[in-house]
Amino acid sequence: CTEIFAQARFRKSSDSTIKVIKAEERLKLENIEKLVEATRNFENLEPGKKFTILAPNNKAFKRLNSKTIDYLLSPEHQSDLNDMLSHHTIEGRYTEKQIRAQIEKEGGKTYFKTLSGFSLMVYLDKDNTIIFVDQNNRKIRMVEPNYGKGDNIIHIIDGVILPYSSIY
């Protein structure tokens, strides 16, 4: 089911999101860059729609099993890679300011549905940092907001959002 969902949602990408990721060398995004290039399907999921992409920095991937990237890049695990990327993509273009406003409007926490179907809980911690909570109850911080122009926006996060049944 996950593979069918991913294939139905993702289409060939234009290069704009990958160009933003590559252009921001100081953010250390080489790992997510490799994964996005391997699928070539990170944006333009449905023509005319806008998306928010949560891009893990390299430090985020270092916290995972050392073989995770190799696993995700192998052709036989393409559906796992698509699933992982869909956990990092939210339909709708939400700036940091809009996310904060939604948290405030909802009384301290809110939810954003990812393309995988998971409702990602979002709140502000005591330091006023935006925190995302994945299915494994791991807390992931937004560390660099608001990259990109046009229909899609990228926020850099310090963790990898993992599916509950994840083997990573």
Where are these regions (language model features)?
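Bacterial N-terminal signal peptides
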Residues: C1-T2
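Mature, structured domains of secreted/extracytosolic soluble proteins
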Residues: F5-Y168
